[in-house]
Amino acid sequence: MAAARRGSAGSEARLSLATFLLGASVLALPLLTRAGLQGRTGLALYVAGLNALLLLLYRPPRYQIAIRACFLGFVFGCGVLLSFSQSSWNHFGWYVCSLSLFHYSEYLVTAVNNPKSLSLDSFLLNHSLEYTVAALSSWIEFTLENIFWPELKQITWLSATGLLMVVFGECLRKAAMFTAGSNFNHVVQSEKSDTHTLVTSGVYAWCRHPSYVGWFYWSIGTQVMLCNPICGVVYALTVWRFFRDRTEEEEISLIHFFGEEYLDYKKRVPTGLPFIKGVKVEL
């Protein structure tokens, strides 16, 4: 049964990668415009062609995987095109690439690393209403400030700093997922599985919650990249509070699962998140 599930997840990983790359082939769109098609017309035909191809090739549930991965690849490709455009939106292109890669890589790494927990939710596209509102708010702020204060969006060194924060956060989070292996899950577990072990090596030797640390700096980095002063502050406060509560919730389960072993680990290794110590234990 486990071998069959791994084989299925491997197939789903390959499917997602193939369709992500298919979506990213929108990078060839400039060739179509040079051939005489108008930009919007070419884009509309391209999107219609992709959807038709996916409908012909796949049936549910594989179509559900394919359409999501293809969409993220398409967004990534558009982000690359925007990044190289001669406009005040080029740094937004960096953001679009970072966002699409984050969501796609969450699914791909889960498929490779912990196939038993793989689902469409692994894309994290339906993370929460708060996440959606936060993303929309950052887009609105960028758009308005780009209209009224375009020079604010052309601070390249600041956007580059944000990009470095995003890359660091992404790499740390994925390192945490690979290190934890089947112990990693997007949902805090309330029951210990037979294969659940306490991971204290690799990046977990540096901090207790490296996946949260990575996501924390990734989130703030996106707003630094966009030069969004309002959302930058709001994101920092919001994600700090979120991870403070999430860390405490998770550590209650970990103490229940591993007892003294986790308490000893907790004493030795910090959370990695600024001013967050984790759940308080009364001795």
Swiss-Prot record:
Cellular compartment(s): Endoplasmic reticulum membrane
Cytoplasmic side: 1-15, 59-68, 112-130, 174-211, 244-283
Chief place of localization: endoplasmic reticulum
Domain of life where this protein originates: Eukaryota
Alphabetical list of InterPro entries matching this protein: ICMT_MeTrfase, PPMT_MeTrfase
Catalytic activity, reaction form: [protein]-C-terminal S-[(2E,6E)-farnesyl]-L-cysteine + S-adenosyl-L-methionine = [protein]-C-terminal S-[(2E,6E)-farnesyl]-L-cysteine methyl ester + S-adenosyl-L-homocysteine
Pfam families linked: ICMT (PF04140)
Record-listed S-adenosyl-L-methionine binding positions: Q189, H196, T197, L198, V199, Y204, H209, P210, S211, Y212, E250
Disulfide bond positions: none
GO CC list: endoplasmic reticulum; endoplasmic reticulum membrane
Record's function text: Catalyzes the post-translational methylation of isoprenylated C-terminal cysteine residues.
Protein's recorded name: Protein-S-isoprenylcysteine O-methyltransferase
Organism: Mus musculus (Mouse)
Organism classification: Eukaryota, Metazoa, Chordata, Craniata, Vertebrata
Gene: Icmt
